Amino acid sequence: MKKRSGHIYYSHPIPAFGSDSEEDGFRVLCITGDFNPERLMDMLEKINTVSMNTIIFLDDSMSLSQRRHFARKLKENQSFSKVFLLIDRVLLFYLAKHYSTNAINRMLMATALPFAYCQPFIPESGKKFPPELFTGRTAELEKIKSPNGANLIYGGRQLGKSALLNMARKEIDGNSQGHRAVVVDVFQLKYPQAARKVSQSLVDEGILDESCECDDWSVLTRHIKRRLMDEENPINYLLLMLDEGDIFIQSCSAIKYQPISELKEIQSSKFKFVIAGTHNLIRFNREEVLSNNIGLTHLEPLTIHPFKTPEGTELLTHALGYLGIRFQDENTISMILAQTNYFPGLIQLYCQKLLEAMKRDYAGYNETETPPYIVTETHLKSVLSDPGFNEMIRQKLDITLKVDKDEGGYYMIIALIIAELYYRKQSDAGYSLAEIREVAVENQIGRLLRLTDEQINELLIEMCDLNVLGDNGGTYVFSTKSFRELLGDQKEVANQLANYIGDGEEA
């Protein structure tokens, strides 16, 4: 643990004894006497009436076989949701012998956690994301934080947009430079309701006075501008971030994007706004924006892509490595990344399921040899073939294809057309925009035919950004078979396309 710019940063990826402890703390239990694994478990069952992460100092020495037996009991216990970290004489002497100020916390976690049960992964994007698990995205984070950086952030579900915004807030808000940062979730809110919620959040954060609460963006931006001119209680930089902003942006089009123009007017070295969403509506409606002579096309966009192999590998292996889990070879890692489509949220889901498998017959591991826990092809298939896991993967990939449903549902239509083309003539080269239009004409999909080639091309680019499609120089294929399999066989694809004949909504 170390402080930088007034904030605490943790050197290990374990939230239980890192960021979670900032609010929840943790319990320290000191035990003397002769304690074998069974006696220890009896004691932990008794104190577990108050569920809390716990460090146990045991004034005794455990043999390796006892330690491994204790590890199995902890991991298989169904009632423990928190971490019990055991430090006995052997481990304590080891840490003392190899003491290093910069490495001691990492060393403790890496030596004790393989013998504990710990679940650090949070695949649900709506939940609080532990900063210790934040992986890669350094350039994207800087563009969000910088006064001269991006204003419009977009990308699909499970790609970590909310985690990026919250990481920016954590690094900026209340730092030693007198900066503030606020994240406001405006999911499903139109511009008046969004203004109300933003003003309330700024009041709650002590940035604006209670009298500043309003539902008018013109009034709200004047309040913000005056607040930044206050020299008695200065804010040297305010970063305002709106998450889940698709409906907000869409509603702004009815009044020529006036709220976004108002925010743009007060943007300076002391203030920046960021709007995150799943779909770049301003770029998609470029003609409308240009025709209204609005300077929004000059706002810098930032696309959040799925991970590349190095980032995906780090997220998959780093925290698990502290828990004593190793992968048999690079092929095993590649299979997992492909199955999860390189989506950070799905990679975390796999890690979560891998750890949960320990609670069922120790995931088939031999107690006398573990830890370490080597993930073999057998363990890989056990998780990947689990019906519950695959259903969750299907649901989350389905969400990705329907992420623009409120703006027309074009992703799903295009995906179905490319699947139809695949079943007609399998081709690694892919399918062109002209071929996509041809199928749309055949099936009378008016919703897609009303779009210009430029707009369809924009959608294809976005689907490539989401790693749904791959671009082969102007022709498009599914990036992985996961999405094609999600859509079904040729008959199922044809039946789904039939739902879009004419102007009808999906059945």
PLM feature segments, named:
Residues 13-38, 54-63, 227-256, 479:
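Conserved P-loop NTPase "ATPase switch" module shared by AAA+ and STAND
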Residues 39-47, 67-78, 218-281, 285-295, ...:
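Conserved Walker B catalytic segment
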Residues 54-57, 174-190:
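Conserved catalytic segments around the Walker B and adjacent sensor/switch elements
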Residues 104-156, 167, 171:
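Walker A/P-loop-proximal flanking segment of P-loop NTPase domains
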Residues 153-183:
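P-loop NTPase Walker A phosphate-binding motif
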Residues 302-332, 350:
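Conserved small helical "lid"/interfacial subdomain of P-loop NTPases
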